[in-house]
Amino acid sequence: MKPGEIIAASGEIELNAGQPTVTIEVSNTGDRPVQVGSHYHFFETNAGLSFDRDKVRGMRLDIPAGTAVRFEPGQTREVTLIPLAGKREVYGFRQKVMGPL
């Protein structure tokens, strides 16, 4: 082993196993691209993204940590979301919640 080397276990790793999911259709109605990170509270994303916000309160994208999804102007795509974990308190972002979910 070398310093800093990571030796991963063999086999497949299933991300967010057992988490309930919600799949929604999202449209970018703006004139600029919008990028949403893996742990961003999806309910509070850019107002130019059109979708049922009430349906996704307390949820984030079901993608690997540190990655993001980009929505080009005029683009519509399906995304899958999972619940935020931990204490289920949201602070910051666009300040739409600022407390427990």
From Swiss-Prot:
Pathway recorded for this protein: Nitrogen metabolism; urea degradation; CO(2) and NH(3) from urea (urease route): step 1/1
Family membership: Belongs to the urease beta subunit family.
Signal sequence annotation: none
Record EC number: 3.5.1.5
Protein name stated in the entry: Urease subunit beta
An example molecular function term from Gene Ontology annotations: urease activity
Keywords for the protein's UniProt record, in alphabetical order: Cytoplasm, Hydrolase
Subunit structure: Heterotrimer of UreA (gamma), UreB (beta) and UreC (alpha) subunits. Three heterotrimers associate to form the active enzyme.
Subcellular location, record wording: Cytoplasm
Domain of life (superkingdom): Bacteria
Principal subcellular localisation of the protein: cytoplasm
GO-annotated cellular components: urease complex
